[in-house]
A protein has these predicted regions:
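Helix-loop-helix junctions that connect adjacent transmembrane helices in secondary transporters/permeases
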Residues: 140-157
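An acidic, gly/pro-interrupted, aromatic-rich
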Residues: 3-142, 172-182
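Globin-like tetrapyrrole-binding proteins
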Residues: 168
Length: 182
């Protein structure tokens, strides 16, 4: 019942009637994910459990705890801010650019990686793109995004077009849309 309520279904898109509303909850407010929300979103978007499927459940949970501990350590800004006030840091940006969670899941050659899985199981550019968007942003790409990516694929200098899917995945993971609750 709650999921079907008008309040729960609010969008962050403003219209002419609620553009200046700050008090009456006429639209959802955009806010950064907490550090833990961001971490668990990363685990889902990267397919972490699929990459680690050879491990038993206890090992997997232990790895998650260790990653979470390191993740929160990286996000600590040293000013005793609450972890709920997470707005991103330089170490977080570096982790998103070069970290093993992002790099391992985005490598199309690595068996079990998200991109490898998508390229194996989906044949068309459209289907592959939809799956990447649904996995990372929990939505389908717009027609404008589809057109833009198809144009990117055609103009890409890559000999191996699979690398363009890695780029798309990396860009979506590093987008504001991924890091914000909207």
């Amino acid at each position: 019942t709650i999921l079907n309520s008008d309040a729960y279904q609010r969008t962050s898109a403003k219209n002419s009637k609620n553009e200046d509303d700050k008090y009456y909850y006429s639209h959802a407010y955009i806010k950064p994910l907490s550090a833990e929300q961001f971490f668990y979103s990363m685990l889902e978007a990267t397919g972490f459990e699929r990459l680690q499927k050879r491990r038993d459940k206890n090992q997997l949970e232990s790895m998650k705890r260790n990653y979470l501990r390191r993740f929160i350590y990286l996000l600590d800004n040293g000013e005793m801010e609450e972890i709920e006030a997470f707005n991103g840091t330089v170490p977080q940006a570096l982790m998103m650019i070069n970290g093993p969670l992002v790099n391992d899941s985005g490598d199309h050659r690595q068996r079990g990686s998200l991109i490898n899985y998508i390229l194996k199981n989906y044949r068309t550019t459209k289907d592959r793109m939809k799956r990447i968007y649904l996995t990372v942003l929990s939505r389908k790409p717009t027609s404008k995004e589809m057109t833009h990516f198809e144009r990117y694929m055609k103009r890409s200098l890559y000999n191996d077009k699979k690398l363009a899917y890695e780029d798309l995945y990396w860009v979506l993971l590093n987008s504001a849309e991924f890091a914000l609750n909207h």
